């Protein structure tokens, strides 16, 4: 049994990790660490955890973690995780960072996050944790940068099409929509019920930190040039769920049926990718509470565009679920371990 710690234990991503780890047969959640609420009981903030999490939250002590813990999940804000992860470079700890600290190059991170980047030594030893695509690199790494929620949905939909030269690398447009939990636990005027109810709001147009992340990892799958995308994200009035609908110029003449077959072949060994039949499209309700990514596609001959829809639960496949999937791969366990549950419906 491996012992795990969650650092930053009071955010939505951490709370989802706690829920999912409860059913993992090989991991014991030994420590929940919160610098702002250490000494407090987690079920005082989250009553749904009553009788399950009985230990008080603890302060961060790096050396104690190195001596006692096998797995660390970093659920801290951007700017914090990179400092903690660097402490584990020379240890045997397996570290999964759910923030954006280790996803980008130093220059891109500084530009998009407006913070000092991680060290090059740390970035060089970090693997990007899009499990279905980078599994071999994940197996060899001890530090994993868990993908963002929008990049997870967008990359899983676009990479197979770019790799097979179905779409152009320029002119890709991504329409992203996420539930309110995607904005995090801390409330603001933009996330109040009276603001979000019966309302759809675009945000961070042209400035979203997931733009360079999507471009970086798409560009690794084309030969001639770097990929540029337009991403517009929207906050919608539901608790959880994320949908990316993508529009990409076609590079070759192809039918929808052939596109569907290509997706099925590309992901035939992937436990958590479900490809919709021709004429059927994903919805967020169909993946709620699960680690699935549902993908549907349509070839629009009239406009010479491929339209791709990709749905995930932003807190599971877009965060905690993918983190556990990566830990499973790192340890040689079946990637479905602790994640074999159906979506919540209705």
Curated annotation (Swiss-Prot):
Q: What is its main location?
A: cytoplasm
**Can you state which reaction this protein catalyses?**
N-acetyl-L-glutamate 5-semialdehyde + phosphate + NADP(+) = N-acetyl-L-glutamyl 5-phosphate + NADPH + H(+)
Function, as annotated, reads: Catalyzes the NADPH-dependent reduction of N-acetyl-5-glutamyl phosphate to yield N-acetyl-L-glutamate 5-semialdehyde.
Record keyword Cytoplasm present: yes
Q: Which SMART domains match?
A: Semialdhyde_dh (SM00859)
Q: What's in the GO CC field?
A: cytoplasm
UniProt-recorded name of the protein: N-acetyl-gamma-glutamyl-phosphate reductase
Give one GO biological process term: L-arginine biosynthetic process
Alphabetically sorted, this entry's keywords are:
Amino-acid biosynthesis, Arginine biosynthesis, Cytoplasm, NADP, Oxidoreductase
Q: In which pathway does it act?
A: Amino-acid biosynthesis; L-arginine biosynthesis; N(2)-acetyl-L-ornithine from L-glutamate: step 3/4
The entry assigns this protein to a family as follows: Belongs to the NAGSA dehydrogenase family. Type 1 subfamily.
Q: Which Gene3D superfamilies does the record cross-reference, listed alphabetically? A: Dihydrodipicolinate Reductase, domain 2, NAD(P)-binding Rossmann-like Domain
PROSITE patterns in the record: ARGC (PS01224)
Coiled coil location = none
Signal peptide range equals none
One GO term in the molecular function aspect is: N-acetyl-gamma-glutamyl-phosphate reductase activity
Tell me which domain of life the UniProt entry assigns to the organism this sequence originates from.
Bacteria
Q: Which residues form the active site?
A: 149
What SUPFAM superfamilies does this protein map onto? Glyceraldehyde-3-phosphate dehydrogenase-like, C-terminal domain (SSF55347), NAD(P)-binding Rossmann-fold domains (SSF51735)
InterPro entries documented for this protein: AGPR_AS, AGPR_type-1, NAD(P)-bd_dom_sf, NAGSA_dehydrogenase, Semialdehyde_DH_NAD-bd
EC numbers on record: 1.2.1.38
List the subcellular locations: Cytoplasm
UniProt keyword Membrane, yes or no: no
């Amino acid at each position: 049994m491996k012992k795990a710690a969650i650092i930053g234990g009071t955010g939505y991503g951490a709370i989802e990790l706690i829920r999912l780890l409860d059913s993992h047969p090989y991991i014991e959640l030994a420590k929940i660490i919160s610098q702002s609420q250490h000494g407090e009981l987690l079920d005082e903030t989250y009553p749904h955890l009553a009788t399950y999490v009985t230990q008080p939250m603890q302060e961060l002590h790096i050396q104690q973690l190195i001596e006692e813990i096998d797995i660390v999940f970093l659920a801290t804000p951007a700017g914090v995780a990179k400092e903690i992860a660097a402490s584990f470079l020379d240890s045997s700890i397996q570290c999964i960072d759910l923030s954006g600290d280790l996803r980008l190059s130093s220059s891109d991170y500084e530009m998009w996050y407006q913070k000092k980047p991680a060290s090059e030594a740390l970035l060089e030893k970090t693997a990007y944790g899009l499990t279905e695509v980078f599994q071999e690199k994940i197996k060899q790494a001890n530090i994993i940068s868990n993908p963002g929620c929008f990049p997870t949905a967008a990359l899983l939909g676009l990479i197979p099409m770019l790799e097979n030269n179905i779409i152009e690398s320029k002119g890709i447009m991504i329409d992203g929509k996420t539930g309110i939990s995607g904005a995090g636990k801390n409330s603001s005027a933009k996330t109040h019920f009276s603001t979000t109810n019966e309302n759809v709001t675009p945000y961070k147009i042209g400035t979203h930190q997931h733009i360079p992340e999507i471009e970086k990892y798409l560009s690794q799958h084309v030969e001639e040039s770097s990929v540029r995308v337009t991403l517009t994200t929207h906050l919608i009035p539901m608790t959880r769920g994320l949908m990316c609908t993508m529009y990409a110029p076609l590079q070759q003449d192809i039918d929808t049926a052939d596109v569907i077959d290509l997706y099925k072949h590309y992901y035939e060994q992937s436990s958590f990718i479900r490809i919709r039949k021709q004429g059927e499209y994903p919805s967020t309700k169909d993946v709620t509470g699960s680690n699935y990514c549902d993908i549907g596609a349509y070839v629009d001959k009239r406009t010479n565009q491929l339209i791709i829809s990709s749905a995930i639960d932003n807190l599971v496949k877009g965060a905690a679920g993918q983190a556990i999937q990566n830990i499973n791969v790192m340890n040689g366990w079946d990637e479905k371990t602790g994640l074999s549950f159906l979506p919540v419906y209705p």
